[in-house]
């Protein structure tokens, strides 16, 4: 289906990107936001999640608290990955690849060094929807932005190469809110492909779903909601797992990062939170 502007209406997994934009718009409207995303409101509005919906849903208290927990996790992971990207380009990396880019607007809202090339990899529908909103907003990227319309289940490395990615140069890879929707074998395959395209000095930022979080949210999730589509759980030893793939990794819990950013989680600590849901990694082998 299309909307009045002729845009394909969000559906399936990529529709969750509009929900993420809604949360980022809410954060941007705060007095002291952890980041500013001026395009988030436009994406949310175009996807039917505009100003009238920029508040927590009125549901039962348990559902409302879960929603707030997810929303805060989106804010924290966004800040975490912004910082990771800033460190990567400060170290000299000039290639950025956003896997499952969705409504990510970092090409437009962050400051990038001259020569930075940012590749947005996603299927054609969300990229087309996004392009329509960007035209409407007359948005201008702050770096060289290259869209790569391809399904991650297909030959995305080939499409990325055709778009100009140079595997001989370091790259910073971002998989934000993506891996939780993929089965374990698909996650393994994706990261093996990423490794094959990563020169020494490359960086990677991942968000992972811990077993407890997936089970706790998916159990009573509404049909079609983001949580109802979560399938992937973080390995028991993510650092060891990534070491086997050629990456030196650090993991961080959302709770620890939230406290560090001055936004402490108000929910009680869960025994099943695991070692971390946020990952920063550096390429050690190729």
From Swiss-Prot:
It is an enzyme of class 2 (transferase). Pfam families: LCM (PF04072). One of its GO terms (molecular function) is methyltransferase activity. InterPro entries: Ppm1/Ppm2/Tcmp, SAM-dependent_MTases_sf, SAM_mthyl_Trfase_ML2640-like. One of its GO terms (biological process) is methylation. Keywords: Methyltransferase, S-adenosyl-L-methionine, Transferase. Transmembrane segments: none annotated. Gene3D superfamilies: Vaccinia Virus protein VP39. Its EC number is 2.1.1.-. Belongs to the UPF0677 family. PANTHER family: S-ADENOSYL-L-METHIONINE-DEPENDENT METHYLTRANSFERASE YKTD-RELATED, S-ADENOSYL-L-METHIONINE-DEPENDENT METHYLTRANSFERASES SUPERFAMILY PROTEIN. Exhibits S-adenosyl-L-methionine-dependent methyltransferase activity. This is Putative S-adenosyl-L-methionine-dependent methyltransferase FRAAL3718. It comes from Frankia alni (strain DSM 45986 / CECT 9034 / ACN14a).
